[in-house]
UniProtKB/Swiss-Prot annotation:
Keywords assigned by UniProt, alphabetized: ATP-binding, Chromosome, Kinase, Nucleotide-binding, Nucleus, Phosphoprotein, Serine/threonine-protein kinase, Transferase
Function: Cyclin-dependent kinase which displays CTD kinase activity: hyperphosphorylates the C-terminal heptapeptide repeat domain (CTD) of the largest RNA polymerase II subunit, thereby acting as a key regulator of transcription elongation.
Protein name in UniProt: Cyclin-dependent kinase 12
Compositional bias per record (Basic and acidic residues), positions renumbered to this chain: 55-76, 315-332, 392-403
EC number, as in UniProt: 2.7.11.22, 2.7.11.23
Compositional bias per record (Low complexity), positions renumbered to this chain: 163-176, 256-281, 408-422, 473-484, 518-533, 609-623
Classification via Pfam families: Pkinase (PF00069)
Family stated for the protein in its record: Belongs to the protein kinase superfamily. CMGC Ser/Thr protein kinase family. CDC2/CDKX subfamily.
C-alpha cells in the first residue's frame, strides 16, 4: 500500500496532469481499490461512455456474483477450508486452462484457510470479523496483482467466455494475412502519407506537435502499406486478427485465467467505439483509428501489428511480434480488468521459443506493455493511447483520468504496468508532448510506481517517438530495447517508459507483487521463467539500468523545461570544443549523457539489420528526418568509446547498446550512405533543437546550403562533398538548417539538462566544428560569455536587502527613497532606490517598471548602471504576506549636479562645464539613438562622482518613442517645470527628442550662472519667463506654434524679443552658440544631441583627458542634502538683519540673474 501511494505520488510529481484530477470520482474509486483492496469494491458508477456502460451492465452479474461469493465466504467463515475450496473451484471452473498458473494460488488459499480454522478454538463474532479482515487483506493482495479494478471485475465472466470462444487455432486465412504483411521496414514515410486519419500535423516532431504530442495522445499509427507503411492503419485489422490468433496458438495454455477471461465480447471490439479490450488473449482487437477517431479497442495490438510489420524481417519474426502483441493486448485487459496473469502471457510467450525470444528483444519486437492500460473506464483507452486523432479533446480527458488512476492504484499497476506504458497512460502519452525527452521524464515516473512494469517492459519496446530513430538491428536494441524499434511513432510511445524504469524500482515492485498475493508470486515466477532465454541479456540490462537510475530521475525532472534543452546544447558544444582541442587527431568525444547523433549509423554497418530493407536505418527516422529522440535509455552514457574519425569502419559498442555514438565522428563514412540514401527525400536535416524544417523547405534545398557558422562549414562542406555528396544525408553531414542561425543564437539562459535528444542536436553542429578545424573553438566561447552575462540578470530579486549596510538617505523619488549603502559581499558602495508597494491596488509603480525595463536595454558609460534588484524579505512567501519593498541597486555616484551647484563648494570653469556637457550629451545621444526619450533631464538627475565622471540617471519617466510615427501622442505632463520646453507648455503631445535637448540647454546655462535659468511655479508663468529671454512664441519665429492646443489661450501682455545672447554674453562664444541653438523655441529648428556633440565647443573635448574638477570629497552633495542645507540657511537668514540677506543675492559677471529682476 505504501509503495503504491509512493508510486502514485511520484507519478503525479512528474505528470503534467493537474492534481485536481484526483478528485475525479473514478480516480477516487480506483484509489479506494488500492487502499481497501479489491474486496471492498463498490458498485461502479455508470461508465462515461455508452459502450462501456453497456459492457459494464452486461458484466454486472459477474460483479454481483463476486459480492455474493464474498458474503457467502464471510458467512461460511466457520468452514474456512470449504471457503478456500469454493474460491479455488470458482476460479478453476471458469478457466480450467489456467490451472498451472492458478494452482499455487489455490493451494495457498486452502492452506491459509485450514490454518485459520485450526488456530481458532471457536468461531465467535470477533474471530469472524478478524477472519473477514484477513480474508479481505488476502483477497486484496491477490486481486491487486490481478488488477481487479472496480470497473473490470464486472467483465470477468464475459471475458472468460469470449476468451474461450477465441482460443481456436489460427485459420489459414489468418496465417496468410499474417504472412502477407511486409517483413522489411519500408522507407521512411513521406509527409503526405505519414498519417492517415490522425489529427496531428503530418510530420510528427515531439517538440513541435502540441496536439498530437500532447501528454495523453501518442503519435499516430501509420499505414503499413503506404509510403509510411511503418505505421499501418488500414491493414491493421486483418493483421491484428491474424497475429492475435497465431499468438493464441502458442500462448493458449499459459495464459492466466483472469487475463484471458476479461475481454469483452468480440462484437464490442468490432466497432470503432467499442471497449478497449480484445475479445481474447490471442486476437488483438482491430484498429479503429483508420476508420474513426473514436476509441479503437485494440489500438494497443494494432500498434504492435504495425510495428511488427515495419520491423520484422521474416514471417517468423512477425509471429513473435504478434505473440507479444497479443499478450500485450491481454496485458491491457489485465491491467484494468484485474487479470494478474497478463504478465504471464507476455513472459510465457517469450519463453516458448528461444529463437523467437531473440526477436522479442530486438527493436522490431512490439512493446509488451500497451494493452495493459486498457481500463474500460473510458472509450478506447487503447485507442486514446495509440491513436493520435484523439489528441485534442480526448487526450486531455484520458490523460487526466488514466494517468492518475493507473498511477494511484497499486492493483492496476501491479503487474500489468510491466507490460504497459509507465504505469499510467499519461506518462506514455505525455512523453510525446515532450518529444524525445519524454522517455526520461516518464521513465522516472514509471519507476516510481510499485508495479512489475519494469520487468517485461524493460525489454518490451523502445520509446515512442524515439523508437523511430533506431534500426532494427538486434544488437543495437539488445534486450533492453533501449534502441527500440523504429516503431510507429505512437506504437512504442507508451511502452518505452517502462523499460526506462530503474532496476531499483523493478526490484521493489517485484517484492510488492510477491507480498501481495500468491498469484502475484506465480506471475513473478512465470516472469522469471519467461526471461530465462535471455537471462544474460537481462542481467546486462539490469546492470546498465543501475547505472542509469540517477540519470533517469534527473531526466524526468529536467525535461519539463523546454528551454533547458537548449542550454544542454551549449554545454555539449563547450565540452566538445574542449575535446576538439585535446584530441589533435580529430576524434569526437560526446558529452557524458549524449547519445548518438545518428541513431542509425551503427546499424548500417551491422550485419543484422533487416535484410529486405535497402534503408534499414532510414526506416527508423521519422518523416521529417528527425530521429525520435527517446529510445536511448540504457546507453552507457558515461563511457561511450568514440572511434577516431580516421577509422573507416563503424565501431559499435555492444556493451552499452550504443546505437551510434561510435560513428558520430566518422564524417567520411561510406557506411552512412545506405541508411539515408534511399530516404533522402523524406529525411530533413536535424536542427539544433530537433525542430522540423520551415514550410517550403526540404532536404534538397539544404543539401548545398552553407552553415550559418562560417568557420565550421567551410571545411565540413568539403567533407560532405568529398565523402558521399548529396546522397550522404547523415545528420552528421547535413548543413545547419537556416531556421536556426547556428548555435550562436541559442539561448544560454537555461540550465543544463542531460537529455539524449539534446545531445543529438548539438552533435550536428559539433561534427561540423570538428570538421571545420580550430576556427570553431574561437567562436563558441562567445556564446558562453553571453550566457553568463544573462545569467547574472536571473539573480535579480533573489537577494535580500540585508546584504547591504544602509549608510544614509541621499534622495527621495516619486516612489520611494534613495539610500547610500555598502555591499557586505563586495564592500562596494551602491545606491538603493526603494520601490514601495504599499498601495496594493496600484501595483508595482509604472515608473519603476519603465526604469527597469529601459535600463536593462541601455549600456553606456554615461548612463547610470542598474546592478540588480533586491527585496526586503528573505523569501517570496514573506514578501507576499507583508507587501514588502523592492530596491533597485545602482552604482553609487558621489554627487548630483544640483547639489554641487547649490553647495557653493565648487566653481566649475569653462573646461569643467564643457566636460560635463560632453558627457551629458553623449549619454543623451545614446538614448535617442535607441529611440528612448528621457523626459526628465534636470540637474538633480545628472550624477557625478569624485573622478569627474557624469552619468544620466532616473529613467522613471523615460519611454520608447516611434521616430517614424510623429503623429502618435504622448503624455504632456513630463519634465520638471523649470526645464520644460515651450512646446510642452503649450500642450504639445506629439513631441520628440528635442524636448530633452531643451532641458540640456537649460543645464548648460545653469552651469555658467550657477542657478536655474527659468524659474516659475506655473506653466503660463514659466512660459512668460522663457519669453523674456528667448522671445515670445510667435508664428514669425515658430511657424507651427499656431497648431498647438494652448496657443490661442496664451494671453501675453507684451511680445518679448529674444535677448539670450545679450543676457549670456559672459559665456564663451562657442558655448553661447550652442546654448542659442539648444534653446531655440521651434523644436524643429532646435539642434539635436548628435549635432551638439559636433559643435565647435564640444567637438574636441575628451573628458578622460581633462583634469578632474575640484569636488568636495568630504561631503556628498545631493539634492536632498542641498534642500536640507538650504532650509537651514533660510532659517538662519530669517534671524539676520535684512541688509545681510540682501548681500547674499548672487550675481555673476555683473549680470542680474533671471528672476532677480
Amino acid at each position: 500500500m505504501h509503495a503504491s501511494s509512493a508510486a502514485a505520488t511520484a507519478l503525479v510529481e512528474y505528470s503534467d496532469v493537474s492534481s485536481e484530477d484526483f478528485s475525479d470520482q473514478e480516480a477516487g474509486d480506483l484509489d479506494a481499490d488500492a487502499g481497501k483492496g479489491a474486496g471492498n469494491i463498490k458498485k461502479p458508477k455508470p461508465a462515461p461512455d455508452n459502450q462501456f456502460s453497456k459492457g459494464r451492465l452486461d458484466a454486472k452479474p459477474d460483479k454481483e456474483g463476486y459480492d455474493n461469493y464474498r458474503s457467502r465466504r464471510a458467512e461460511d467463515s466457520s468452514d474456512p477450508v470449504a471457503a478456500g475450496s469454493r474460491q479455488t473451484s470458482s476460479s478453476e471452473a471458469t478457466n480450467p486452462r489456467e490451472e498451472p498458473s492458478q494452482a499455487s494460488n489455490t493451494s495457498k488459499d486452502e492452506l491459509w484457510g485450514r490454518e485459520i480454522y485450526m488456530s481458532s478454538d471457536s468461531i465467535d463474532t470477533d474471530e469472524l470479523e478478524a477472519e473477514m479482515k484477513r480474508q479481505k487483506r488476502k483477497k486484496q493482495k491477490k486481486e491487486k496483482h490481478k488488477h481487479k479494478s472496480k470497473k473490470k471485475s464486472k467483465k470477468r465472466k464475459k471475458k472468460r467466455a469470449k476468451s474461450y470462444s477465441s482460443i481456436d487455432s489460427m485459420s489459414d486465412n489468418d496465417i496468410n494475412a499474417l504472412l502477407d504483411r511486409r517483413y522489411t521496414p519500408p522507407t521512411a514515410p513521406s509527409k503526405s502519407n505519414e498519417r492517415t486519419v490522425s489529427a496531428a500535423p503530418s510530420s510528427f516532431t515531439p517538440h513541435n506537435l502540441k496536439e498530437s504530442s500532447s501528454p495523453a495522445t501518442p503519435p499516430p499509427v501509420r499505414r503499413p502499406n503506404t509510403n509510411s507503411n511503418y505505421y499501418g492503419e488500414s491493414s491493421l485489422e486483418t493483421a491484428n486478427s491474424a497475429l492475435g490468433s497465431n499468438l493464441q496458438v502458442t500462448v493458449t495454455n499459459k495464459q492466466s485465467i483472469s487475463n484471458r477471461l476479461r475481454s469483452p465480447p468480440p462484437s464490442s471490439r468490432s466497432s470503432g467505439n467499442g471497449p478497449r479490450f480484445g475479445n481474447s488473449p490471442r486476437t488483438p482487437p482491430p484498429s479503429h483509428y483508420s476508420s474513426s477517431g473514436g476509441g479503437g479497442v485494440g489500438s494497443g495490438s494494432v500498434v504492435r501489428d504495425s510495428r511488427s510489420s515495419r520491423y520484422v524481417n521474416s514471417p517468423h519474426k512477425e509471429d513473435v511480434s504478434a505473440h507479444h502483441r497479443s499478450s500485450h493486448d491481454h496485458g491491457y485487459q489485465g491491467r484494468y480488468s484485474g487479470a494478474g496473469s497478463s504478465s504471464h502471457d507476455t513472459r510465457k510467450v517469450k519463453r516458448l521459443s528461444p529463437e523467437l525470444d531473440r526477436y522479442n528483444h530486438q527493436p522490431s519486437t512490439p512493446p509488451h506493455k500497451r494493452r495493459k492500460f486498457s481500463d474500460g473506464r473510458e472509450v478506447g483507452l487503447g485507442n486514446f493511447e495509440h491513436s493520435r486523432h484523439h489528441s485534442g479533446k480526448y487526450e486531455r480527458y484520458s490523460r487526466d483520468r488514466y494517468s492518475r488512476r493507473s498511477s494511484r492504484s497499486p492493483s492496476v499497476q501491479h503487474s500489468r504496468s510491466r507490460q504497459s506504458p509507465s504505469g499510467g497512460l499519461s506518462s506514455g502519452s505525455n512523453a510525446f508532448r515532450h518529444g524525445g525527452s519524454h522517455k526520461h521524464k516518464y521513465g522516472t515516473t514509471v519507476s516510481s510506481t510499485p508495479s512489475h512494469t519494469t520487468r517485461t517492459s524493460k525489454r518490451a519496446s523502445g520509446t515512442g517517438t524515439s523508437g523511430d530513430r533506431y534500426s532494427r538491428s538486434p544488437r543495437t536494441s539488445s534486450r533492453y530495447m533501449e534502441s527500440s524499434p523504429p516503431s510507429p511513432v505512437g506504437a512504442s510511445g507508451s511502452h518505452h517508459y517502462h523499460h526506462r524504469r530503474s532496476p531499483r524500482m523493478r526490484q521493489r515492485t517485484r517484492g510488492d507483487s510477491r507480498r501481495r498475493s500468491p498469484s502475484s508470486a506465480s506471475s513473478e515466477s512465470s516472469a522469471s521463467r519467461s526471461r530465462s532465454p535471455t537471462s544474460r541479456d537481462l542481467k546486462h540490462k539490469r546492470e546498465e539500468y543501475i547505472k542509469k537510475i540517477s540519470e533517469t530521475s534527473l531526466f524526468a525532472e529536467l525535461v519539463k523545461d523546454r528551454h533547458k534543452r537548449q542550454k544542454a546544447l551549449k554545454e555539449i558544444i563547450e565540452r566538445q570544443e574542449e575535446n576538439s582541442n585535446s584530441n589533435s587527431n580529430g576524434a569526437l568525444t560526446i558529452n557524458d549523457n549524449s547519445s548518438s547523433v545518428d541513431g542509425n549509423t551503427p546499424n548500417a554497418a551491422d550485419g543484422r539489420s533487416a535484410p529486405g530493407s535497402g534503408t534499414p536505418a532510414a526506416a527508423s527516422t521519422t518523416s521529417n528526418g528527425l530521429q525520435a529522440l527517446g529510445s536511448k535509455p540504457d546507453l552507457d552514457l558515461n563511457n561511450i568509446p568514440m572511434p577516431n574519425k580516421q577509422n573507416d569502419s563503424v565501431v559499435s559498442n555492444p556493451a552499452s547498446n550504443a546505437d551510434v555514438p561510435d560513428s558520430v565522428a566518422q564524417l567520411k563514412q561510406p557506411l552512412l550512405v545506405p541508411p539515408f540514401s534511399a530516404s533522402k527525400n523524406n529525411i530533413k536535416p536535424k536542427s539544433l533543437t530537433s525542430l522540423p524544417l520551415p514550410p517550403g523547405m526540404n532536404v534538397l534545398d539544404l543539401a548545398g546550403a552553407r552553415s550559418p557558422s562560417p568557420g565550421q562549414k567551410k571545411e565540413s562542406d568539403e567533407k560532405n562533398v568529398t565523402s558521399s555528396g548529396s546522397a550522404n544525408k547523415s545528420v552528421l553531414n547535413l548543413p545547419m538548417p537556416p531556421v536556426i542561425p547556428g548555435s550562436e543564437e541559442l539561448s544560454g539562459d537555461d540550465d543544463v539538462i542531460d537529455s539524449p535528444e539534446d545531445f543529438d542536436a548539438p552533435a550536428v553542429g559539433t561534427v561540423h566544428g570538428h570538421g571545420g578545424g580550430p576556427g570553431t573553438t574561437r567562436q563558441r566561447p562567445v556564446i558562453l560569455n553571453r550566457r553568463d552575462s544573462r545569467n547574472n540578470v536571473r539573480d535579480w530579486g533573489e537577494r535580500c536587502v540585508d546584504v547591504f549596510e544602509m549608510i544614509a538617505q541621499i534622495g527621495e523619488g516619486t516612489y520611494g527613497q534613495v539610500y547610500k549603502a555598502r555591499d557586505h559581499h563586495t564592500n562596494d558602495m551602491v545606491a538603493l532606490k526603494k520601490v514601495r508597494l504599499e498601495h496594493e491596488k496600484e501595483g508595482f509603480p509604472i515608473t519603476a517598471v519603465r526604469e527597469i525595463k529601459i535600463l536593462r536595454q541601455l549600456n553606456h558609460r554615461n548612463i547610470v548602471n542598474l546592478h540588480e534588484i533586491v527585496t526586503d524579505k528573505q523569501d517570496a512567501v514573506e514578501f507576499r504576506k507583508d507587501k514588502g519593498s523592492f530596491y533597485l541597486v545602482f552604482e553609487y555616484m558621489d554627487h548630483d549636479l544640483m547639489g554641487l551647484l547649490e553647495s557653493g563648494m565648487v566653481d566649475f570653469n569653462e573646461e569643467n562645464n564643457a566636460s560635463i556637457m560632453k558627457q551629458l550629451l553623449d549619454g543623451l545621444n545614446y538614448c535617442h539613438k535607441k529611440n528612448f526619450l528621457h523626459r526628465d533631464i534636470k540637474c538633480s538627475n545628472i550624477l557625478m562622482n569624485n573622478r569627474g565622471k557624469v552619468k544620466l540617471a532616473d529613467f522613471g519617466l523615460a519611454r520608447l518613442y516611434n521616430a517614424d510615427d510623429r503623429e502618435r501622442p504622448y503624455t504632456n505632463k513630463v519634465i520638471t517645470l523649470w526645464y520644460r520646453p515651450p512646446e510642452l507648455l503649450l500642450g504639445e503631445e506629439r513631441y520628440g527628442p528635442s524636448i530633452d535637448v531643451w532641458s540640456c540647454g537649460c543645464i548648460l546655462g545653469e552651469l555658467f550662472v550657477k542657478r536655474p535659468l527659468f524659474q516659475a511655479n506655473a506653466e503660463m508663468a514659466q512660459l512668460e519667463t522663457i519669453s523674456k529671454i528667448c522671445g515670445s512664441p510667435v508664428p514669425a519665429v515658430w511657424p507651427n506654434v499656431i497648431k498647438l492646443p494652448l496657443f490661442h489661450t496664451l494671453k501675453q501682455k507684451k511680445t518679448h524679443r529674444r535677448r539670450l545672447r545679450e543676457d549670456f554674453e559672459f559665456m564663451p562664444a562657442p558655448a553661447l552658440d550652442l546654448l542659442d541653438k539648444m534653446l531655440d523655441l521651434d523644436p524643429d529648428k532646435r539642434i539635436t544631441a548628435e549635432d551638439a556633440l559636433r559643435s565647435p565647443w564640444l567637438r574636441k573635448i575628451n573628458p578622460d583627458e581633462m583634469p578632474t574638477p575640484q569636488l568636495p570629497t568630504w561631503q556628498d552633495c545631493h539634492e536632498l542634502w542641498s534642500k536640507k542645507r538650504r532650509r537651514q540657511m533660510r532659517e538662519q537668514q530669517e534671524s539676520l538683519p535684512p541688509t545681510v540677506i540682501a548681500s547674499t543675492k548672487y550675481q555673476q559677471h555683473g549680470a542680474t540673474m533671471v528672476g532677480d529682476a
